[in-house]
């Protein structure tokens, strides 16, 4: 039997919208420990890694590890119908995913499970030299600013400051984040680093995922992938790994 109930359908809406920025179909794995997903976008530029421990659910019944393969757009459309005080439950039965919204009325949606080809993705082993935590909406706003002049941004870290830089024939934009200004919560620079990333993916991810957590964790190194972590209240995590853009 597989069934899990989450008390806030809106938070699930934010999670699903965030996942849908890089994948159309998702191969969730439900185990007694919790719900997880690891997937690559079709262009193999970005990877998403989601884990929600079983204790975050109001009800969680999973006897054995079970794959739940579904079209994210189907789930997203259901969640757009959710009311502010709705609970949401997911159940797997007879080859179908059953989603129930419970509030003033109980509304049930049923979708066929799908087959998703592909191998299990290993956890990347990377050596980051910069780790920082900052306000997620501040990072989102800086990306919006950078998109005015460029299709890519450079992240640069030195001492106790982090910069987001954008440059093109249209102009230049520079955003500096630090603990003293309140935009950074913490920063650890083992070695000065800089790397460039495409704004398109960054903006898609952050503009959806920032609603999940006020704080965004960033880790990177020179010309290495960027890891972005959004903590889900109670112990869950939503992580993205974005390949660098080589200049």
Swiss-Prot record:
InterPro entries: DNA_clamp_sf (IPR046938), Pr_cel_nuc_antig (IPR000730), Pr_cel_nuc_antig_C (IPR022649), Pr_cel_nuc_antig_N (IPR022648)
Gene3D superfamilies: 3.70.10.10
Pfam families cross-referenced by the UniProt entry: PCNA_C (PF02747), PCNA_N (PF00705)
Signal peptide range: none
Keywords: DNA replication, DNA-binding
SUPFAM superfamilies, alphabetized: DNA clamp (SSF55979)
UniProt superkingdom: Archaea
GO biological process: leading strand elongation; regulation of DNA replication
CDD domains listed in its UniProt record: PCNA
Zinc recorded as keyword: no
One term of GO molecular function: DNA polymerase processivity factor activity
Entry similarity comment: Belongs to the PCNA family.
Subunit structure: Homotrimer. The subunits circularize to form a toroid; DNA passes through its center. Replication factor C (RFC) is required to load the toroid on the DNA.
Role played: Sliding clamp subunit that acts as a moving platform for DNA processing. Responsible for tethering the catalytic subunit of DNA polymerase and other proteins to DNA during high-speed replication.
Protein name, UniProt field: DNA polymerase sliding clamp
Gene (name only): pcn
